[in-house]
Structures are given as C-alpha cells and as structure tokens.
C-alpha cells in the first residue's frame, strides 16, 4: 500500500470512533485535549524518558512539571514522574508501600475503600497485598471511626491507607484530613488517589463546595505520603499523561531497579519506555492556562453539572448524593438495562458499582445542549 491508501484506510477506522465534541461521551473522565497539545505532540513525538540521558531537555521538563504539580498540591519538595495514567500511578504507590513495609518487617496489609478504582485490585493481585475494606458512610466515604478502631486493635498489621479524592463513580472525597492524623499517629503510609480530583479540587469555587464537607486532600496534610494526579483528565493534556507524586525523594530508594545499559543506571517507573509527549504537553498547557484558566475550566464544568442536576430533577430523577465535583450519579434500579438502551441511541454513560445509579462525568467537551438532549433521551427511555 502507498501512503495515501494507508491514510485513507486509517481514516475509515478513525471514523468509527466517537468524538468528544459530538457530546455523546458522558461516562469518560477524559476529554478533548487542548488544541496546543497537537503542536507539542509533533515536537516531542520521538522522545523517550525511559532513557533520560539521551533526552536531557525533556527530562528537565518532567522535573519542572512535577514541581508545578507539587505547587498545586502544596509541596515544594515533591518527587515523582509523569507516567501512563492513574493505574500506573496507583500501582507505583502500592509498590512503594510494599517495599517500605518489607523494610520495616511489616505485613503488607492496606486499607482501601470499596469506592477505590479497580487499579488497586490489580495491585492486590500483582503484589499479593492484603486488603482491608472499611464500611462506607452515607456519603460514600470511608468510615474513619472504623479505621481508627481497626488500627488500634491491630496496630502492627496495617502498613498503609488509600484515600480517594474524587472517586471514579461518585466524585466523593474521603476524609483525608482525619486519615492523615491517623497515619501520623500510627506511623503508617497514606496514598491519595486524586487522579480525577487533583485537577478539580484546587480550583473549585467555594460556592460549589458542600457545607460540612472536608475538601482537604493534599501534601498540606502531614500524613499524606503520595498522590495520584492525572493531567490527561481535567488538566486537558493528551492521553497518556498521568502523574504520581511522593512527599520527597526518599521514596525513590524503594522504587529503583538497576538499569545498567541505559544512560541513567537506575529506573523507578513501572514502564520503561515513556514518551515525552505527556510531559511536554502538560508543561505547555499548565503554563498557558495557569491557575485562573483552570479555575475557569472547573467552574464552567460545575455550572453545567448543576444544570444537569436541576434538569434531571425536573424530569423526576434523583441523585445518589449531591455532586461533590463534576460527577453525577442518577439513581436507577435498572442501570445496566438503561445504559444499553441509551447506547442504542449513541449515548455513552456508565454505571456505579456501589449504588444503583447511572454515572455521568461532566467534562469540558459537554455543552448545555448535549446535556439537555441526553436527559430527554433518558426520560423517553424510562417511559418504556
């Protein structure tokens, strides 16, 4: 095949994909990247951060991006990497937890909520972790009292806690403030999965924050050891650009393996070959948008979220919880059936595991007319 025929054939395949801007994707935490990402991607498409000595400029960019993310998360000494996404970030954190626990002769018992992302199930299988699942409160957050009591009863058996800041299904935030105190008091590690919430919570206007809800989640809390934060979600970076940040660079000692044939003799990330596109795009987009740009982006998404909730209630639908961020769960006892019927009309939503509900993520690509069209279709679907 010649080049033109190849491109023509590839366009046929690409035409079968949904496009974010069409407004039918309502269940994804990813969105259309910022337009500048296309130019940056072309500039950095051949870079490989797996061998940083060959790509010194891109490697410097990664350190700058980690520093920028650390600034958002209140840590000027953060250490970490831009990697493939939240799954790799969470696996990396759990790998560090396991190795630190082994060095202290502790069992690898980790408290992880039912609302945690399925990447922690992968970590459990891969690393033979023992997982404790605490009960959830009515707000779908971990029961802190249960955790405190459990650790007091079995102090030497718990090596770490995972808290969620913007859970995949509902957007709920565990009480990281209290979990941090527990971690400090008991000298155990605390990882915060803010893959989604990391680019939402710092920019959220007070008017959208629920009364009585604690939104603290980052390194301003002494007990937080590590945080997952994904630029390719609400950060508008192209896929794949996930982030793992640790409190300081001492954690590197528990991640490094020898890599004698590379330009740097040790490597800490799970994936060896890493494109520099995610790093460079994240750097450029963060520099372009700045704090004010992300505040505007988040608050526009929250305005649309509130519109969705208001209109849904007018149709007679109820939310499982009041939205904590731009994720909405609409109660539905026949969630799987409804989801499939909506898919026949090209609407792609998802379902919650921990509650009978449809899950909608109000990402920047969604417009008011998309939301209104979806709710009309949902209402018609439920009539039959």
UniProtKB/Swiss-Prot annotation:
Question: Which cofactor is essential here?
Answer: pyridoxal 5'-phosphate
So what does this thing catalyse? L-tyrosine + H(+) = tyramine + CO2; L-aspartate + H(+) = beta-alanine + CO2
- Offer one example of a GO biological process linked to this entry: coenzyme A biosynthetic process
**Pfam families attached to this UniProt entry:** Pyridoxal_deC
Q: What is its EC number?
A: 4.1.1.11, 4.1.1.25
In this UniProt entry, which cysteines form S-S bonds?
none
Please tell me whether the keyword Lyase is annotated for this protein. yes
Q: Extract the SUPFAM superfamilies matched here.
A: PLP-dependent transferases
Mark the residues carrying the PTM N6-(pyridoxal phosphate)lysine: 233
Keywords of this entry: Decarboxylase, Lyase, Pyridoxal phosphate
Pathway listed for it is:
Cofactor biosynthesis; methanofuran biosynthesis; Cofactor biosynthesis; coenzyme A biosynthesis
Do you know which InterPro entries this protein is assigned to? GrpII_AminoAcid_Decarb, MfnA, PyrdxlP-dep_de-COase, PyrdxlP-dep_Trfase, PyrdxlP-dep_Trfase_major, PyrdxlP-dep_Trfase_small, Pyridoxal-P_BS
Q: Enumerate the GO terms in the molecular function aspect.
A: aspartate 1-decarboxylase activity; pyridoxal phosphate binding; tyrosine decarboxylase activity
Sum up the protein's function in the record's words. Catalyzes the decarboxylation of L-tyrosine to produce tyramine for methanofuran biosynthesis. Can also catalyze the decarboxylation of L-aspartate to produce beta-alanine for coenzyme A (CoA) biosynthesis.
Q: So what family is this one in?
A: Belongs to the group II decarboxylase family. MfnA subfamily.
What protein name does the entry list?
Answer: Probable L-tyrosine/L-aspartate decarboxylase
- Give the organism the record lists: Methanococcus maripaludis (strain C7 / ATCC BAA-1331)
